[in-house]
C-alpha cells in the first residue's frame, strides 16, 4: 500500500474537463504504466464517481431540452430567397437545370453546415448545462450531426439511386417532419426504414455464401515451408501509418529483416507492436510477410501463414476453424453497412473550391489577353485563365498583387471596383486521383406544348445521320413556341389547311381518331379520305406511307368551282398525284385508281439521283403474303437509294434493289398473325384443307402444310399450298431445298409430272421423328416491262428552263431476294415500283449544281385554285442574302455541312383573296392553324396566335397612322398601297424565321376599300400573280417571261425609342425576346416570346419558353417539330465526383465477391485478369508466359480484390483484419482454366482445376501445362469444391448429386459441412487429433526433388531478369495496391 502511495505522490495532478478523446489517452497511458489489472481497478472507481455525480445532478433528457437555434428562421429564409432568385434565372433561361441543381444543393448544404456550427455556441451561451449539449459535447452519447438533426435541420438527403434530392428537409426532429419530408427521409437517411428492412436479409445471405466457400479451411500444420511472401512498405506514401500497423501486427515474417548489416528480425517471427514501431522508426523496406495467399496447402492452412489469433494474441492453435471465422467476420458487419452511404451526393466537383478574396477596397486590373470568358458550374459568367495571372488591386495609397493559379475562375471584370473581402476568384481544387469522377446524364423534359426552335447552328450527331439527335457546339437557347396541339388523324377531312386563320365562326373536324395500328415493320397506319367533287359518295383509300412516311391522297384536281373551294382538304402535300386516266375511264373500270406519286423529301431538297416521282404498276400488286425470288438470274443488289427510317429510335434500312432482270418470281403463302394467348387448332407440320378452322376466329383460305412459329408474344402461322412429295432413294430433288426448278425438268418417279407447265419451288421439310418430305409450291412469274414512259407526263414547258435536268426511268424491286413479304390488314403489296430519277447533266456551266429544290405551289386567281410543282436548281455552296451574324436568323446545318439559312421544309402558299374572302377574314381571328410533323412523323396541327399564347404589346406612340394613310390614298390611290403593302396590296409575309409563312392581312380595311375601285386594275394587270418562296423572294410567273423581281427584304426593322435606358431598340421580325427586356416606354416586357408582327403602334409576340443548353448537350427532336408536354428536350452530360462509390456498402461488397461487372466498380477485374495474362504471354512466349502469366495474374487480382473490399468497409468505419478477407479471396482465385494452347495429356481443355494441383501435376510429369487464371464468384466457388456433399447442401441439390453419381466422385469428408450432414465428428477443435497424419517424409521428398526440378534455374533467371518489368506493371495497374507487392522467390516451392 505504501508503495502505491509513494507512486501516487509522484503522479501529475490534472485539473481539467476531459472528453472522450482525453479519456482514451488517459486509459492507454495507464495501461502502459501500470498494466491491465491496475487500470481496470482505476477505471472502476472513475465509473462509480461518474454515477454518483450524475445521480447528484440528476441529468435527464426531456423534450423541452431540445432547443432550436434562434438564427434558424432567418438562415432558412435567406436560403429560400436565394433559391427563389435561382428559380427565376432558370425560368428566364439564364441557367439550365444542372446548374440550378448544383447551386441549390450548395445553398442548402451551406445553410445546414452554418446551422450546425451555430449550435454549440448557442448552447454554451443560453444553456451550458443542457443535457443534450453535455452528452454530445462530452462524447458520451451522440455526435454533432445527430444533435444537429434533432435541433437544427435534417438537411439534404439522397434518393434510392444515390442522387441528391434538391428539396432539403428544413424541419428538425424536434419540430416534426411533414409527410413529404418523412417519405424523403425514409429513403435517404443512413438507417432509413427502407434501408434496414432490406439490409438484414442481404447480410444474412452473404454470410451463408461466404461460410460455404471457406468452411473446410482449418489450421492443420505448424509450417508449410513456403518461401514466398508479400511485401509491405511504408515508404511510398500510398499507405497511411495506421493501415500499415494494422496490416503488420499479428503476421509472421517471411524473410529476415536487416538494418544495414544488423538483423533486427528473423524469418517466421511473429510481429508485435514493438517490432512495428521499430520498422516505422528505421523505415525498414520492404517487409515480406506470410499471408494465407502464400500458404502451399490446398485445402487447409498452416499456423505461420495465418499468424496470431485475434482473440488471445498468440499464434493460432491447431485445429481452429479459421475459414468459418473469416466468413462470419466479413458477413456479420454487413448488417452495419448501409446499402448506400449518406453523403452529400458528390455534387461538388473536386471538393468545394477555394476562394481568393480581395485584400482591400480598390479597382482591379489584369491583363485581359490572358483570360477568356466562360461559365462557372453555377452558370455565372466568369473568366478562366490558362496560365498564372497577376491581378493588381489599386487602393488609395497601396497596390496589392494577387497571384491566381491556372485553370481558376476570375469572377470580376477588369477595372471593376471591389470591396475588401469580396470574392474575386475561385481556385479549382486539384483533382486527386482518389476522387474519381463519373459522368451522369440528366434529361430535361419540356413542360409545355408547342414547336421547337433553336437559335444557333447545330451539328448532327454523326451516328444518327437520319435521326433526331443533335449536338450543340456553343451555349444557346432552345425555344418552345407555345401552341395547342390538335389531333388531326383525319387531316384531309379537316377544313383547315396549314396557315389558315380560324374565325370565330369557323369549325374544325370533331375528334375522330383512328388508333395507329402498330404493324410488324413499325409502319404507321393512316386512313385518308378523299372527297369526290362529282356527286359520288366518299371512298376510302387506306395507304401505308411506309418509305418516307409521306401522306398520299388520290385526289383529282380539275378546276374546282369557287363554291366548293372550302370543301377541298387544303393541306401541304409532300406527294402529289397526276391523274393518268380520265374520270370516264375510271368509272368504266373497277380497278383502283393508280396515279403517279411525286415524292418530295421533308426538307424539299432533292439530291442528284434521288427519286422525283414513282408509279406503282397495278400489274405487280399482290393481295397475299409470300416470298420474292430472283431465281438464277444475277441481280445487281446495289441499294441505289437507301432509305433509313428512324422510328422511335429504331434504325432500319429499306434498300430498293435496282433490277437488271427481266423477270422475278413470287411464291405465295398464307399467313396469320395471332396474339400469343390464342389457342391454335392445328399442329405444326400438319396438312389441312381449304377453309379449315385454325384458331377460334380464323379459318384458312387455302389448303396445304401448316408451319407455326412463336415470336415475342405472338404466334405466326403460315400455310404453304402445294403438293407433298415423298422422295425415293435415288431421287435427286430430295437433296435440294429452297430451289426454283424451271419448267420442263419435271419430277422423277412421279406420276403427275407437270412438264413444261410452270416454274415450281421445292422446299424440304423434316418434321420431328418422321421421314422428311418435299413440298412443291406453285410460283407466280412476273415479267418486267419498261412500264409507262413517265417523262411524257410532265408538260415540256416545265423542263424548258432547266434543260440540264434530265429524268430517267428506273425500275426498283421493293423487296430483296428471299425476303418474306407480309400482307397487313388486307392491303395489297406492291412488288415493283417504277421510279423517275432526277439526273442533272453536268455541263461546265452548271457543274456546281448539286441539288434541286421543289415545292408545290397552290395559286388562287379569282376564286379558282390550281396546284403546280415548282423545281428550282440550287447552287451547291448555298449563299443566300441572309446576314450570317444576324442573331434573329436561324441557321441549320445539313448533312453535307453547308449552311442553309432559312430553308423552309414546308412550301409556302400565297393567295390572292377575292372580295368575299377578305371580308370574311375581317372577323375576329381566333387563331391560326399550323401543321407540322410530330416525333412519330404524323401530321399534327397546332393552333397558334390564339388569345392563349399570343399577346400584343403597345401602343408605342400615339400617332394614328391609319388616318394619314387613308387621306393620302384618296388622293393618289395605287402608289401608296404599293409602297405600304407590298406588290400584292395584301400582306407582307412575316416569315423570315423558318417554318412560318404566316399570312397576316395588314390594314385590311384599306385593301377592301380600294379593291372595290377600278383604278387598281392596272397594277394587277402588270403583275399577273406572284409566288412567294420560302426565302422570301417574289417570283413573277408571267407566262411569257420569267423575271425574278428584287427579293423582298422581309427582315425589316422597326426603330422606336425605349425610355427605360434612353437608347433605341431595334426590333426585327422573328426575333426572340426574353423576359423582362425593355422594349417599350411603359416598362419591361413581361413574357418571353417571338416577334410575329411589327406595326406602327404595336407588336404581336407569340409566347415562347426558353431553355438554356450548354455546349456538348444533346438536343432531341428536329427543328420545327411539335413537342408534347413531357417529351425529352435536352440531355446534359456532366461530371460529378463521388466519394468512393454511391452504391456503397453491402451491394458493393457483394459485387466484388461475386465478381460481377457493374459500372460503379472502377475496374472490371475479370477483363484485367485477361489483359495481364495476354501482356505477359506476349512478352515471354509459351509456355513460360502461361505459367508466369497465370501466377502473376492471380497474385495481382488477389491484392486488388482485398483492397477493394477493405476500402468499402473502411469507408463505413468497420475494421476487419486483412487475413479474413485474404482467406476468402484465396478460395475464389485458386482455380485455373486449362487452355488449349499447350495440349497436355492430363487435363481436358476448359477444365477447372486447382492452381496447386496443376503445378504439382506439371512437376510430376515434367511437362508444362498451359492454363489461365479465372475469377470465380463466391457462389460459383462453393459449387466447385472437392466435396459434392457440401455442394449439394448449398444449391442445385439434384443437379450436383446427379453429376457426382455419373462421374463416380468420391467425397473424402475433409470439411466441416460434409461431416455435419453425415453426422460424423467434425475435424476441428477436439475432433482434429484423429486426422493428423505424420507426413514428415512428404516434406523431405519435396526438398530432395528440388535439384531435379527442370524449371528452377531458368525460372529464376527469367523472374529476376523481368523483375523490373513486373514492378512497372504493378505500379501502373494499381493506384492503391502498392502497399503489397509480390516477391517472386522460387516458384519451385509451390
From Swiss-Prot:
Subcellular localization is given as: Plastid, Chloroplast
Ranked from the top, the taxonomy reads: Eukaryota, Viridiplantae, Streptophyta, Embryophyta, Tracheophyta
Q: Which InterPro entries match?
A: DNA-dir_RpoC2_beta_pp, RNA_pol_beta''_euk, RNA_pol_Rpb1_3_sf, RNA_pol_Rpb1_4, RNA_pol_Rpb1_5, Rpb1_funnel_sf
Quote the subunit structure annotation: In plastids the minimal PEP RNA polymerase catalytic core is composed of four subunits: alpha, beta, beta', and beta''. When a (nuclear-encoded) sigma factor is associated with the core the holoenzyme is formed, which can initiate transcription.
Detail which positions bind Zn(2+).
224, 295, 302, 305
Where's it mainly located?
plastid
A single GO molecular-function term is: DNA binding
Instruction: Quote the EC number.
Output: 2.7.7.6
Cellular component (GO) terms are: chloroplast; DNA-directed RNA polymerase complex; mitochondrion
Q: What does this protein do?
A: DNA-dependent RNA polymerase catalyzes the transcription of DNA into RNA using the four ribonucleoside triphosphates as substrates.
State the protein's name: DNA-directed RNA polymerase subunit beta''
Q: Known Pfam families for this protein? A: RNA_pol_Rpb1_4, RNA_pol_Rpb1_5
NCBIfam families in the cross-refs: rpoC2_cyan (TIGR02388)
Give the superkingdom in one word. Eukaryota
Amino acid at each position: 500500500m505504501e508503495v502505491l502511495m509513494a507512486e501516487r505522490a509522484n503522479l501529475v495532478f490534472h485539473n481539467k474537463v476531459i472528453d472522450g478523446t482525453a479519456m482514451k489517452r488517459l486509459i492507454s497511458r495507464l495501461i502502459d504504466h501500470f498494466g491491465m489489472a491496475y487500470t481496470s481497478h482505476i477505471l472502476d472507481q472513475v465509473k462509480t464517481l461518474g454515477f454518483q455525480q450524475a445521480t447528484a445532478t440528476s441529468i435527464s433528457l426531456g423534450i423541452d431540452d431540445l432547443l432550436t437555434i434562434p438564427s434558424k428562421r432567418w438562415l432558412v429564409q435567406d436560403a429560400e430567397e436565394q433559391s427563389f432568385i435561382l428559380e427565376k434565372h432558370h425560368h428566364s433561361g439564364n441557367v439550365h437545370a444542372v446548374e440550378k441543381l448544383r447551386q441549390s444543393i450548395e445553398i442548402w448544404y451551406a445553410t445546414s453546415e452554418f446551422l450546425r456550427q451555430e449550435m454549440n455556441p448557442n448552447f454554451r451561451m443560453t444553456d451550458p448545462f443542457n443535457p443534450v449539449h453535455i452528452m454530445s459535447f462530452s462524447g458520451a452519447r451522440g455526435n454533432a450531426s445527430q444533435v444537429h438533426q434533432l435541433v437544427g435541420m435534417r438537411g439534404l438527403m439522397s434518393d434510392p439511386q444515390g442522387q441528391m434530392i434538391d428539396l432539403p428537409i428544413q424541419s428538425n426532429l424536434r419540430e416534426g417532419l411533414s409527410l413529404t419530408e418523412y417519405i424523403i427521409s425514409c429513403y435517404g437517411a443512413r438507417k432509413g426504414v427502407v434501408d434496414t428492412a432490406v439490409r438484414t436479409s442481404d447480410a444474412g445471405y452473404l454470410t451463408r455464401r461466404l461460410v460455404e466457400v471457406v468452411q473446410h479451411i482449418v489450421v492443420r500444420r505448424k509450417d508449410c515451408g513456403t518461401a514466398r511472401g508479400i511485401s509491405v512498405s511504408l515508404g511510398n506514401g500510398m499507405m497511411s501509418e495506421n493501415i500499415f500497423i494494422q496490416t503488420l501486427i499479428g503476421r509472421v515474417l517471411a524473410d529476415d529483416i536487416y538494418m544495414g548489416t544488423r538483423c533486427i528480425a528473423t524469418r517466421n517471427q511473429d510481429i508485435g507492436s514493438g517490432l512495428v514501431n521499430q520498422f516505422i522508426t528505421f523505415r525498414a523496406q520492404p517487409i515480406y510477410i506470410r499471408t494465407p495467399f502464400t500458404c502451399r496447402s490446398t485445402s487447409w492452412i498452416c499456423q505461420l501463414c495465418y499468424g496470431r489469433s485475434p482473440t488471445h494474441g498468440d499464434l493460432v492453435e491447431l485445429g481452429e476453424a479459421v475459414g468459418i471465422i473469416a466468413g462470419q467476420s466479413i458477413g456479420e458487419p454487413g448488417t452495419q453497412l448501409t446499402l448506400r452511404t449518406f453523403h452529400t451526393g458528390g455534387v461538388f466537383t473536386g471538393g468545394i473550391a477555394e476562394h481568393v478574396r480581395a485584400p482591400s477596397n480598390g479597382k482591379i486590373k489584369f491583363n485581359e489577353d490572358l483570360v477568356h470568358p466562360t461559365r462557372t458550374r453555377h452558370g455565372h459568367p466568369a473568366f478562366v485563365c490558362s496560365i498564372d495571372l497577376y491581378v493588381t488591386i489599386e487602393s488609395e495609397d497601396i497596390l496589392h498583387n494577387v497571384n491566381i493559379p491556372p485553370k481558376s475562375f476570375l469572377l470580376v471584370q477588369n477595372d471593376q471596383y471591389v470591396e475588401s473581402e469580396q470574392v474575386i476568384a475561385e481556385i479549382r481544387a486539384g483533382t486527386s486521383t482518389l476522387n474519381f469522377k463519373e459522368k451522369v446524364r440528366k434529361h430535361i423534359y419540356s413542360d409545355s406544348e408547342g414547336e421547337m426552335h433553336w437559335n444557333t447552328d447545330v451539328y448532327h450527331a454523326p451516328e444518327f445521320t437520319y435521326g433526331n439527335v443533335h449536338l450543340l457546339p456553343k451555349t444557346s437557347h432552345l425555344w418552345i413556341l407555345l401552341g395547342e396541339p390538335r389531333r388531326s388523324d383525319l387531316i384531309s377531312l379537316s377544313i383547315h389547311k396549314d396557315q389558315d386563320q380560324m374565325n370565330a365562326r369557323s369549325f374544325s373536324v370533331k375528334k375522330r381518331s383512328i388508333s395507329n395500328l402498330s404493324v410488324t415493320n413499325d409502319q404507321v397506319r393512316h386512313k385518308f379520305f378523299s372527297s369526290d367533287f362529282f356527286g359520288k359518295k366518299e371512298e376510302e383509300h387506306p395507304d401505308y406511307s411506309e418509305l418516307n412516311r409521306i401522306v398520299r391522297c388520290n385526289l383529282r384536281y380539275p378546276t374546282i368551282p369557287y363554291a366548293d373551294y372550302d370543301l377541298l382538304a387544303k393541306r401541304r402535300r409532300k406527294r402529289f398525284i397526276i391523274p393518268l386516266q380520265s374520270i370516264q375511264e375510271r368509272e368504266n373500270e373497277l380497278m383502283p385508281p393508280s396515279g403517279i406519286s411525286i415524292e418530295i423529301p421533308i426538307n424539299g431538297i432533292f439530291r442528284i439521283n434521288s427519286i422525283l416521282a414513282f408509279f406503282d404498276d397495278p400489274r405487280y400488286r399482290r393481295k397475299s403474303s409470300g416470298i420474292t425470288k430472283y431465281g438464277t438470274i444475277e441481280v445487281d443488289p446495289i441499294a441505289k437509294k437507301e432509305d433509313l427510317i428512324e422510328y422511335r429510335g429504331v434504325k432500319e434500312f429499306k434498300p430498293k434493289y435496282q433490277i437488271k432482270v427481266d423477270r422475278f418470281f413470287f411464291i405465295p403463302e398464307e399467313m396469320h398473325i395471332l396474339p400469343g394467348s390464342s389457342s391454335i387448332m392445328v399442329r405444326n407440320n400438319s396438312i389441312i384443307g381449304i377453309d379449315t378452322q385454325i384458331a377460334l376466329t380464323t379459318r384458312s383460305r387455302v389448303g396445304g402444310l401448316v408451319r407455326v412459329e412463336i415470336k415475342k408474344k405472338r404466334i405466326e402461322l403460315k400455310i404453304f399450298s402445294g403438293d407433298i412429295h415423298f422422295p425415293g432413294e435415288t431421287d435427286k430433288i430430295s437433296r435440294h431445298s429452297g430451289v426454283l426448278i424451271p419448267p420442263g425438268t419435271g419430277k422423277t418417279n412421279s406420276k403427275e409430272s407437270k412438264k413444261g407447265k410452270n416454274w415450281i419451288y421445292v422446299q424440304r421439310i423434316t418434321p420431328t421423328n418422321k421421314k422428311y418430305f418435299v413440298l412443291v409450291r406453285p410460283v407466280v412469274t412476273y415479267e418486267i416491262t419498261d412500264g409507262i414512259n413517265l417523262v411524257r407526263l410532265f408538260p415540256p414547258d416545265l423542263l424548258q428552263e432547266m434543260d440540264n435536268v434530265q429524268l430517267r426511268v428506273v425500275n426498283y424491286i421493293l423487296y430483296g431476294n428471299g425476303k418474306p413479304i407480309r400482307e397487313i390488314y388486307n392491303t395489297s403489296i406492291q412488288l415493283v415500283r417504277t421510279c423517275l430519277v432526277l439526273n442533272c447533266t453536268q455541263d461546265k456551266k452548271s457543274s456546281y449544281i448539286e441539288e434541286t429544290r421543289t415545292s408545290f405551289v397552290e395559286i388562287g386567281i379569282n376564286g379558282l385554285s390550281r396546284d403546280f410543282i415548282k423545281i428550282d436548281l440550287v447552287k451547291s455552296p448555298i449563299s443566300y442574302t441572309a446576314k450570317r451574324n444576324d442573331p434573329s436568323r436561324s441557321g441549320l446545318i445539313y448533312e453535307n455541312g453547308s449552311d442553309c439559312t432559312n430553308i423552309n421544309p414546308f412550301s409556302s402558299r400565297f393567295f390572292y383573296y377575292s372580295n368575299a374572302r377578305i371580308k370574311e377574314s375581317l372577323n375576329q381571328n381566333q387563331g391560326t392553324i399550323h401543321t407540322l410533323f410530330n416525333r412519330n412523323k404524323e401530321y399534327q396541327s397546332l393552333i397558334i396566335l390564339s388569345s392563349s399564347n399570343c399577346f400584343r404589346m403597345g401602343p408605342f406612340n400615339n400617332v394614328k397612322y391609319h388616318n394619314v394613310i387613308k387621306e393620302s390614298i384618296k388622293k393618289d390611290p395605287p402608289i401608296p398601297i404599293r409602297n405600304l403593302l407590298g406588290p400584292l396590296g395584301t400582306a407582307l409575309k412575316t416569315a423570315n424565321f423558318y417554318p412560318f409563312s404566316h399570312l397576316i392581312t395588314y390594314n385590311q380595311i384599306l385593301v377592301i376599300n380600294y379593291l372595290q375601285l377600278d383604278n387598281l386594275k392596272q397594277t394587277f394587270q402588270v403583275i399577273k400573280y406572284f409566288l412567294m418562296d420560302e426565302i422570301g423572294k417574289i417570283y413573277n410567273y408571267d407566262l411569257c417571261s420569267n423575271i425574278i423581281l428584287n427579293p423582298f427584304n422581309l427582315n425589316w426593322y422597326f426603330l422606336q425609342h425605349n425610355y427605360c435606358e434612353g437608347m433605341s431598340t431595334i426590333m426585327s421580325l422573328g426575333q426572340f425576346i426574353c423576359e423582362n427586356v425593355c422594349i417599350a416606354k411603359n416598362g419591361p416586357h413581361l413574357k418571353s416570346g417571338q416577334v410575329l408582327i411589327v406595326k406602327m403602334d404595336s407588336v404581336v409576340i407569340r409566347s415562347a419558353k426558353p431553355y438554356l443548353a450548354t455546349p456538348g448537350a444533346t438536343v432531341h427532336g428536329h427543328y420545327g417539330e411539335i413537342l408534347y408536354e413531357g417529351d425529352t428536350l435536352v440531355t446534359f452530360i456532366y461530371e460529378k465526383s463521388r466519394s468512393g462509390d454511391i452504391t456503397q456498402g453491402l451491394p458493393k461488397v457483394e459485387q466484388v465477391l461475386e465478381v460481377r461487372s457493374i459500372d460503379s466498380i472502377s475496374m472490371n477485374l475479370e477483363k484485367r485478369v485477361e489483359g495481364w495474362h495476354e501482356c505477359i504471354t506476349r512478352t515471354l512466349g509459351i509456355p513460360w508466359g502461361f505459367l508466369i502469366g497465370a501466377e502473376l495474374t492471380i497474385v495481382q487480382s488477389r491484392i486488388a480484390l482485398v483492397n477493394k473490399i477493405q476500402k468499402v468497409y473502411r469507408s463505413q468505419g468497420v475494421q476487419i483484419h486483412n487475413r479474413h478477407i485474404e482467406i476468402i479471396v484465396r478460395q475464389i482465385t485458386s482455380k485455373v482454366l486449362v487452355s488449349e494452347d499447350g495440349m497436355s495429356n492430363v487435363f481436358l481443355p476448359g477444365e477447372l482445376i486447382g492452381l496447386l494441383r496443376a503445378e504439382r501435376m506439371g512437376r510430376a510429369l515434367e511437362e508444362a501445362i498451359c492454363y489461365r487464371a479465372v475469377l470465380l464468384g463466391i457462389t460459383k466457388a462453393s459449387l466447385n469444391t472437392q466435396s459434392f456433399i457440401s455442394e449439394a447442401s448449398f444449391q442445385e441439390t439434384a443437379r450436383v448429386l446427379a453429376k457426382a453419381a455419373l462421374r463416380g466422385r468420391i467425397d473424402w469428408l475433409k470439411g466441416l459441412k460434409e461431416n455435419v450432414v453425415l453426422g460424423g465428428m467434425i475435424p476441428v477443435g477436439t475432433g482434429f487429433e484423429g486426422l493428423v497424419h505424420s507426413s514428415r517424409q512428404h516434406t523431405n521428398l519435396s526438398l530432395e526433388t528440388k535439384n531435379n526440378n527442370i524449371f528452377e534455374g531458368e525460372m529464376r533467371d527469367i523472374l529476376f531478369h523481368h523483375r523490373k518489368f513486373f514492378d512497372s506493371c504493378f505500379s501502373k495497374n494499381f493506384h492503391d495496391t502498392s502497399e503489397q507487392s509480390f516477391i517472386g522467390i522460387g516458384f519451385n516451392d509451390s
